[in-house]
């Protein structure tokens, strides 16, 4: 994962270069390892690199051997080994997992993203046609923004974070996931079209527990593609604990197959998995896990149990309420949002990411996406029917790029730490989003708590020779929102502080430019003021989506799971 900035068809690109470098410097936190830039005709690409794969040779922008194609990527392409084999006639110049995008473009034109398995946001310049193509991964794990200026309407800008675009652009949009932009037509079109995207289509595929297990294991294995130390974010909840357990097993397997102590960094190695799904490299010989919370937080206690059970080298960090409050301005600056849920959950993740990076780790696995896929948020218990349950699930997955994916990407990349999310693997999504939603429904009378089928898939009861993935009390632990699990006093402290900072008079007088998007709580009002101080342009605010449960299901507007009625009913 890195940071990219691009300006296509700039009227004076060479004079603009110093400014482009300064704008890209605003996202150097995303790529502290190296900065690169290239100009071709009237287009400039700038890249801030975080080196994880192809460490010695993968600097960007990448240019084809004939100099006609220029590529800038923020992401990881997990099937790059297979893509290299498909493009054997192309002259590769690096070991980067991203370089195969160029020959895939030559082979498939704007359909190239369809063949990429990974998380990515990229721009590719074709000098022969004076054409730029930009694409974002299917779910929007990786951030990308697009901007235009009324003063220079022919110029198109792209950046990993919108703070790079605010100087030049009066129109900024979040680039839609699963889409590709082609300057030849000046249109953005969808390339990712799985059947489950149609929320009106209610699937009926029977449950296959072993298929779920094997698919998630493969998804984790793919994401251990790295030449640097990695770890897992471990909250002690179901999602992060499953990812940690699988990662510990896969790390042990990879360590046995490829002993890192014999790894020659100067030799030509391709990190990743082969056609048989076998992992060829291991960043560390043991898995390291990381947890954060207020002292004695529920997450910290659960994470200790999991780490001990799976044998990870565990690192526990605590923060005080004041440290969290002190970080809010930085969190909002990096996240570029005023959404209450995102800010609450991102602040501990932001603080933890700094600690992790200080320990020399560059990549972590994280558990985002499971709640959307399996209806794990506690308000899903109020779903009136399986059809409505599924429709809400699809909508939540579609909006992940504006919520949990944004949080996971920006709160970690603020410190040059890459977060990978196995639950959002393309194959895993295809499998799980096509399961009959009746199987996912929360049915207390039948003993089916939230994410029952995911828990059941990794329950080895009845498999006498199988090693358990998790302790039973963790596998069947009730859902906590991350911002709740780090300590209930975290949310209470935010609310109390907002009450003290925002007077009744202020709260009764929202800004006229907010229009109908008026904060309904003093906490939300406080965050919006902080956001506006950093990003006063309306076009920036228009990129923000507020995460709230479905009010028409009788749910409280406060997004904390603790305020959902179902939380009071501990389901056996």
From Swiss-Prot:
Active site per the UniProt annotation: 2 (for gatase activity)
Under which EC number(s) is this enzyme classified?
Answer: 6.3.5.4
Q: Which residues does the UniProt record annotate as the domain Glutamine amidotransferase type-2?
A: 2-186
Q: Which GO terms describe its cellular component?
A: cytoplasm; cytosol
Q: Which BP terms does GO give this entry?
A: asparagine biosynthetic process; L-asparagine biosynthetic process
Q: Give the catalysed reaction(s), semicolon-separated.
A: L-aspartate + L-glutamine + ATP + H2O = L-asparagine + L-glutamate + AMP + diphosphate + H(+)
Keyword Amino-acid biosynthesis attached: yes
Asparagine synthetase domain sequence ranges = 194-546
Q: Which residues carry this modification: Phosphoserine?
A: 265, 509
User: Which UniProt keyword terms apply here?
Assistant: Amino-acid biosynthesis, Asparagine biosynthesis, ATP-binding, Glutamine amidotransferase, Ligase, Nucleotide-binding, Phosphoprotein
Q: For ATP, which residues are the binding ones? A: 233, 292, 366-367
Q: Any idea what this protein is called?
A: Asparagine synthetase [glutamine-hydrolyzing] 1
Gene name, per UniProt, is ASN1
């Amino acid at each position: 994962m890195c940071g990219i900035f691009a300006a296509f068809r700039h009227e004076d690109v060479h004079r603009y270069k110093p400014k482009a470098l300064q704008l890209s410097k605003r996202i150097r936190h995303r790529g502290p390892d190296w900065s690169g830039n290239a100009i071709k005709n009237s287009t400039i690409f700038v890249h801030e690199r975080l080196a994880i794969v192809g460490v010695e040779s993968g600097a960007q922008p990448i240019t084809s051997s004939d100099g006609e194609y220029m590529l800038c990527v923020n992401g990881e392409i997990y099937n790059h080994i297979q893509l290299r084999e498909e493009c054997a006639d192309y002259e590769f110049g690096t070991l980067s997992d991203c370089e195969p995008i160029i020959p895939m473009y030559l082979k498939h034109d704007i359909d190239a993203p369809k063949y990429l398995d990974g998380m990515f946001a990229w721009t590719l310049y074709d000098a022969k046609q004076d054409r730029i193509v930009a694409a974002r991964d299917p779910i929007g794990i990786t951030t990308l923004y697009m901007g235009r200026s009324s003063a220079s309407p022919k110029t198109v800008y792209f950046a990993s974070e919108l703070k790079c675009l605010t100087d030049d652009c009066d129109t900024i949009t979040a680039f839609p996931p699963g889409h590709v932009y082609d300057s030849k037509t000046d249109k953005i079109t969808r390339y990712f079209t799985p059947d489950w995207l149609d929320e009106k289509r209610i699937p009926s595929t029977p449950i296959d527990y072993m298929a779920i297990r094997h698919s998630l294991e493969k998804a984790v294995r793919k994401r251990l593609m790295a030449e640097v130390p990695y770890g897992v974010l471990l909250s002690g909840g179901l999602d992060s604990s499953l990812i940690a357990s699988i990662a510990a097993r896969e790390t042990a397997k990879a360590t046995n197959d490829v002993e890192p102590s014999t790894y020659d960094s100067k030799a030509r190695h391709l990190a990743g998995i082969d056609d048989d799904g076998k992992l060829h490299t291991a960043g560390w010989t043991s898995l390291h896990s990381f947890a954060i919370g207020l002292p004695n937080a529920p997450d910290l206690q659960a994470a200790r149990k999991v780490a001990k059970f799976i044998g990870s080298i565990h690192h526990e960090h605590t923060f005080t309420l004041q440290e969290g409050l002190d970080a809010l301005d930085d969190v909002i600056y990096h996240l570029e949002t005023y959404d209450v849920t995102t800010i609450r959950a991102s602040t501990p993740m932001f603080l933890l990411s700094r600690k992790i990076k200080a320990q020399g780790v560059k990549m972590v696995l994280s558990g985002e996406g499971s709640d959307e896929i399996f209806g794990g948020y506690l308000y899903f218990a109020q779903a009136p029917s399986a059809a409505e349950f599924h429709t809400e699930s699809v909508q939540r997955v579609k909006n992940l790029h504006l919520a949990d994916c944004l949080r996971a990407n920006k709160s970690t990349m603020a410190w040059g730490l890459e977060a990978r999310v196995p639950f959002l693997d393309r194959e895993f999504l295809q499998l799980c989003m096509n399961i009959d939603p009746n199987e996912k429904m929360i049915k207390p009378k039948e003993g089916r708590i939230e994410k029952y089928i995911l828990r059941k898939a990794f329950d080895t009861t009845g498999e006498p020779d199988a090693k358990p993935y998790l302790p039973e009390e963790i596998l069947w632990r009730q859902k906590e929102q991350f911002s709740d699990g780090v300590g209930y006093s975290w949310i209470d402290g935010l609310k109390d502080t907002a009450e003290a900072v925002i007077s009744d008079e202020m709260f009764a007088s929202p800004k006229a430019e907010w229009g109908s998007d008026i904060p309904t709580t003093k906490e939300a009002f406080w965050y919006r003021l902080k956001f506006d101080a950093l990003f006063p342009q309306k076009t920036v605010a228009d990129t923000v989506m507020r995460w709230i449960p479905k009010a028409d299901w009788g749910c409280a507007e406060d997004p904390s799971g603790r305020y959902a009625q179902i939380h009071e009913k501990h389901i056996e």
